């Protein structure tokens, strides 16, 4: 009898279907390794799977070697929390260090993108290369897992061999944007227990179980940077090259510390304002001119220089693993938490698409991901190469 047989949650019983003895017995033959991050979502995911009868074990992975960064890196505290949750649930916690793989497959790419003037999203690459690749392989080969599970707010449908990725039920927390680069094979080997409910339900279950992570705040920002200033972190790895800030007319109105510190559509932190002969409208970054090391800015949120009618995306990944062969009418997100944009996606070749928005959009940022949806289903996406004006 596991500890969780003694632990109970009224909220769990209310939101999750009760399985028959037959279903529980079937699930009892299946081993699931849960990625325990030390957060509330993975904690409750482990409990849900236990309640559903699976053989559950946890795996905590470390992806970053802190040197003197203990103030910023929460790895030790997260491991302690993950261990406390596993002890309470009565499950085993394995540990693995993927710092080398992370550096080689995620961090080096992150730096090279910044060097090239783009704004990358390392979380997407981490999911593709580490959580659903290195982690998945280790869980299957070394720990004998039939599936892995994570605390992501997404859902899956279809059989394992033809799995589809869907948005999480909680629209506010949906994380399909970050998982769009997974293949149907990776989705088919994964379970997402909290994707079927809202975040408030997850917190309530954790409270009722008395889990140490119940009130822990969600992690935000890039995992290897933690709470520290992004600028300071980047400066340790990439030398900054200060240069001019110019208006779209070519007038120099200030200096920047380095193009890599700025992103398209940015308004704050430009250090310009109250310029003689200019109105009070806020300044926005509209271009990063790498060749001349110039940051180009324009005034006003609705300035046409900020807008684009579409984008070109490359490095495409489709969950179905089938390249796009004909024009697709769907919706796209060009950043996380954005409202879906109706669009037309035109294949140029297997690795490039042109995306035409129904309405012009602002701050479409090279290096970020364009992610495509058909209703609830996340189809895949690519890296934004350039805007179409």
Curated annotation (Swiss-Prot):
Binding sites annotated in the UniProt record for ATP: 35-42, 61, 151
Lineage top rank: taxon: Bacteria
Active site: 126 (nucleophile), 223 (cysteine persulfide intermediate)
Gene3D superfamilies given in the database record: Adenine nucleotide alpha hydrolases-like domains (2.30.30.280), HUPs (3.40.50.620), Translation factors (2.40.30.10)
Entry keyword set: ATP-binding, Cytoplasm, Disulfide bond, Nucleotide-binding, RNA-binding, Transferase, tRNA processing, tRNA-binding
Residues annotated as transmembrane: none
Annotated spans, Interaction with target base in tRNA: 121-123
Paired cysteines (S-S): 126-223
Compartments reported by the entry: Cytoplasm
InterPro entries (alphabetical): MnmA-like, MnmA-like_C, MnmA-like_central, MnmA-like_central_sf, Rossmann-like_a/b/a_fold
Positions marked as site (Interaction with tRNA): 152, 368
Record EC number: 2.8.1.13
Region (Interaction with tRNA): 173-175, 335-336
Enzymatic reactions: S-sulfanyl-L-cysteinyl-[protein] + uridine(34) in tRNA + AH2 + ATP = 2-thiouridine(34) in tRNA + L-cysteinyl-[protein] + A + AMP + diphosphate + H(+)
Alphabetical list of PANTHER family matching this protein: MITOCHONDRIAL TRNA-SPECIFIC 2-THIOURIDYLASE 1, TRNA 5-METHYLAMINOMETHYL-2-THIOURIDYLATE -METHYLTRANSFERASE
Record-stated family: Belongs to the MnmA/TRMU family.
Free-text function comment from the UniProt entry: Catalyzes the 2-thiolation of uridine at the wobble position (U34) of tRNA, leading to the formation of s(2)U34.
Classification via NCBIfam families: PRK00143.1, trmU
Protein name: tRNA-specific 2-thiouridylase MnmA
Gene source species: Actinobacillus succinogenes (strain ATCC 55618 / DSM 22257 / CCUG 43843 / 130Z)
